Design a protein with these regions (language model features):
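Electropositive, gly/pro-rich neighborhoods at or near active sites that engage anionic ligands
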Residues: 2-205
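Accessory, usually C-terminal, subdomains that scaffold auxiliary metal cofactors
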Residues: 208, 214, 218-260
Length: 260
């Protein structure tokens, strides 16, 4: 009842003009970032050159939203949480956050119990991150679990913008790519690699390209698995049989768990 009342008050406040609707990019934030752009790229490159196991990751917006919603609703609602809710910066509905997680990131089934298990998994995986691409204001809610360097997304996602791109490290390596679209990735690598970027170091020649097709379960896509956890275990088992030097993982809500 309280949850419905809070959402009703927020909706009424927006209609009356007392509360403003958040802008689409209001969740973006760079104030936790320690290294930007070229410095961030260089830090990633030097970290990889050390040759030690490391995890470079970022939060998906729906994944972090689910975790933060779970964390803030597990305790009595503070005034600061309520203020952020009324400003549209927080969700207080676990069901709604899991629905978004299913639609946009592939989690299933939509269930409070399964959602709680997912959030616990993420919280347990966060300490494994060595470098985080930081860009979301609500990362502040999981800061206590972090022990990592935080860089901006362009320094991580856009090596083609910088001198000595960190992806140069991939040259001569056995590179595993986990992604739903492995066929197009294979085709681009084999047929267009040298034409994709002006700087050849952005996408160098690997010793071997190893491909694993990730489970695709966004927007309720049917799979052969009972739940997200079974699908994750299938991919973990498949990857554990492979010999590779570095993994590039892009597969929605599965990504951080696989990397950890």
């Amino acid at each position: 009842i309280l949850l419905y009342a809070l959402y009703g008050l927020r909706k009424a406040g927006r209609k009356l003009g007392v509360l403003a609707s958040p802008s689409p990019d209001s969740f973006l934030c760079s104030r936790y970032v320690e290294l930007f752009d070229q410095e961030a790229n260089d830090f990633v490159y030097e970290t990889l050159r050390e040759g030690k196991p490391c995890m470079i990751s970022k939060f998906g917006t729906t994944e972090l939203n689910a975790v933060v919603t779970d964390l803030v609703t597990s305790e009595p609602l503070s005034w600061s949480v309520l203020k952020e809710f009324f400003r549209g910066e927080l969700s207080l509905s676990r069901v709604q956050s899991i629905l978004q997680l299913q639609k946009l990131s592939g989690f299933f089934p939509v269930s409070p119990d399964y959602g709680r298990r997912f959030c616990e998994r993420v919280v347990n995986d966060i300490p494994e991150i060595n470098i985080l691409g930081s860009y979301i204001e609500n990362e502040k809610y999981v800061l206590p679990y972090m022990h990592c360097k935080r860089i901006n997304l362009d320094g991580y996602y856009a090596p083609f913008l910088w001198k000595n791109p960190w992806t140069k490290y991939l040259e001569g390596k056995k590179v595993l790519v986990v992604h739903p679209f492995v066929d197009s990735i294979k085709s681009q690598y084999e047929n267009n690699r040298e034409r994709l970027f002006d700087d050849p170091d952005v996408l160098p020649r690997f010793k071997e390209l190893i491909l694993v097709r990730a489970v695709q379960s966004i927007v309720g896509t049917r799979t052969d698995y009972v739940d997200w956890f079974e699908a994750l275990k299938h991919m973990e088992d498949e990857i554990s049989q492979l010999d590779f030097d570095i993994a590039l993982i892009g597969c929605g809500a599965y990504g951080m768990a696989l990397a950890a």
